[in-house]
Amino acid sequence: MSPEKIEEIRKIVKIAYERAQNTLSAIEHRAIYESAQVVSDNIPGYSADTLEFGSYDKDNFAVLFIDMRQSTKRAKTIGAEKTFLSMHAFISGMLEVVKSRQGVVIDIMGDGLMVFFGGKSSPLTKRQAVQAAGLCGKEMLDVIHNVINPLLSADNIWQITCGVGVDYGDVIVTKIGINDIYDVKALGDCINKASKYCEKASDEVIVSKQIYDLWPSSSGGMIKFLVKDDGYVLSKGG
């Protein structure tokens, strides 16, 4: 990620953080994000309006999970207000990185994200989607180190550590629910594996063999793969 992009994200994170501070000072404990799209029913290329209940559509995605380490202990230690500030800085920074890599946020969990790359409706090829997901994970950690944690440290707030997991594979998209309560869900082994790698990772990106095999090759590449259990840790090459 270029220094210019890092600086752009730094400004966005700072705005989100200061907005959260202003909210606290006014004692308005409420969510302040405005989004152009609802995360639910957000599988790329699929809509609840056009799918039938029990539908079975097959697609392929690179799947990324990022999750905060020791988030429960951290929240208990620093308290609700500092957790509130931390999450506004963290989520805004992560969403900017996802956007820069053409990812689609499928879910915002309490302390992390699930993101899809590629698919039938995406302009990205299979290999491009795989590379985008892996590089997104690396850049997420870079933004945490270089943007978010310095901001938190300035206010004596416990720094954030995250793990990232990435896999690629078949995904089944289906519409689940009843007539007035329903959602579009993605199901697949690659989702489970990406989540598993995320749980194992600490301040690193762990990817599957499928990601390793599909990664575009180039001489003097900037990324190398280090074997870890049944996956690989993405590391800087050169």
Give short role names for the model-derived ranges:
Residues 38-41, 59-63, 104-109, 160-165, ...:
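Short, functional N-terminal and low-complexity linear motifs
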Residues 14-24, 40, 68-73, 120-125, ...:
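Short low-complexity stretches enriched in small and charged residues
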Residues 43-48, 147-149:
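Short gly/ser/thr-rich secondary-structure transition/capping motifs
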Residues 1-46, 202-238:
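Intrinsically disordered, glycine/charged-rich C-terminal tails and inter-domain linkers
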Residues 120-237:
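Catalytic beta-strand-to-alpha-helix segment of the class III nucleotidyl cyclase homology domain
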Residues 12-18, 34-36, 56-63, 157-160:
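Short acidic/polar alpha-helix capping motifs at helix-coil junctions
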Residues 17-43, 71-91, 131-145:
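Charged, low-complexity, helix/coiled-coil-prone segments
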Residues 50-132:
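Catalytic NTP-binding/metal-coordinating core of nucleotidyl cyclase/transferase enzymes
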